[in-house]
Amino acid sequence: MKTQSDLKDRFVIIMAGGRGERFWPLSREKMPKQLLALLGKKSFLQEAVDRVLPLVPAKNIFIITNAAQLPEVRKQLPKIPKQNLVAEPIGRDTCAAVTLGAALVGARSTTGVMAVLPADHVIPEEKKFQQVLSDAFDLAARGQAIVTIGIKPTEPATGYGYIHVGQELPTPPGAKKTKTTFFKAERFVEKPNYETALEYVNSGQYRWNAGMFVWSFITVTNGLEKHQPEMFAACQRWFKVANNPAKLAKTLAKEYPEIKKVSIDYALMEKAQNVVVADGAFEWDDLGAWPALSRHLKADAEGNCAVADFIHVDAARNIIFDARTKNRTPIAVVGLRDSILVQTDDAVLLAHKSQAQKIKELVKKLAADPKLKKLV
């Protein structure tokens, strides 16, 4: 039995095919949130790759995106081999992406251990994250555990799913004690209301479900075979052509539209009995919509967060973002409260913070309008 994972057998799958519609008008189909540099000089995807490079060689990192975004992904990630940048023909939720990732890894190494990570998370404490991920790699390499990284809640958030953790797991015989604490996963729960979330946080027995998973190729395919046999069959077919980009693209174009659209949480994580939670004791954030930016931008005395030449009178708790690339002029505001104001070269968004989730509905209306769909 392995006591730790070999570097050459470590792989990372970064899921980067989302559209980030709640960050419209800056996030577009060809340049979505994960490809934007909202908080620094690098995009979220570039930062996600940089975080794992100390643990995994570039040749073992795969990016799963879509055809519209593939050119920009290639441009942003010159160190990642082109054949490792794979486009889904159509979005079929996270189970399909995980299945594709498993086929890609298995074609390289059937003894491989892979981490599946989102492209758009904010993780300032990189060293702590790397320690947890490394320990999770080692645990997944030792046996049949499905490891998920759970984040210790800092507030009763209602926008995340939660994981109920059970007893702390002892260090396996012959293995070194890790810095990371591992728990048995008792159950996954959907996004709660505020009162329930408060109970979860106060109990200390729940973690945020961050959508980060670590497992061996053998473990995840065994799980798919048991709980999602159709996905397992697809994985077997894709495995055979995974090292031939042209054949893989042709196969995916034919088969992907018929693949069941289901999340990996529902398809596998909620059903499996061998799930272990790695305690993610590091600062973490999932920027789901514009209001989340206020957690990372410096605010003025009235609580306004501005990335703009901004002047105001009697305005408070607003997010002002000027993304124009030319003809930038001051943005002047009077009497505005708790709002989002975003300006790009071709569009302006004004929304109340409490309605930020409805920006996705707005994008659908734009897409349905022949004159305005170019803005999506």
Language model region names:
Residues 1-9, 217-376:
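Left-handed beta-helix
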Residues 8-10, 58-59, 81-82, 109-112, ...:
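Short coil/turn connectors at secondary-structure junctions
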Residues 1-14, 22-32, 37-118, 122-130, ...:
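Conserved N-terminal catalytic core of the sugar/cofactor nucleotidyltransferase
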Residues 91-96, 155-157, 194-195, 284-285:
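A short acidic, often aromatic-flanked loop/helix-cap motif at beta-alpha or helix-coil junctions
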Residues 62, 114, 212-213, 285, ...:
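A residue-level structural signature of the nucleotidyltransferase/glycosyltransferase Rossmann-like core
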Residues 45, 101, 120, 163, ...:
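Residue-level signal for inorganic ion chemistry
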Residues 126-254, 276:
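Conserved core of the sugar-phosphate nucleotidyltransferase
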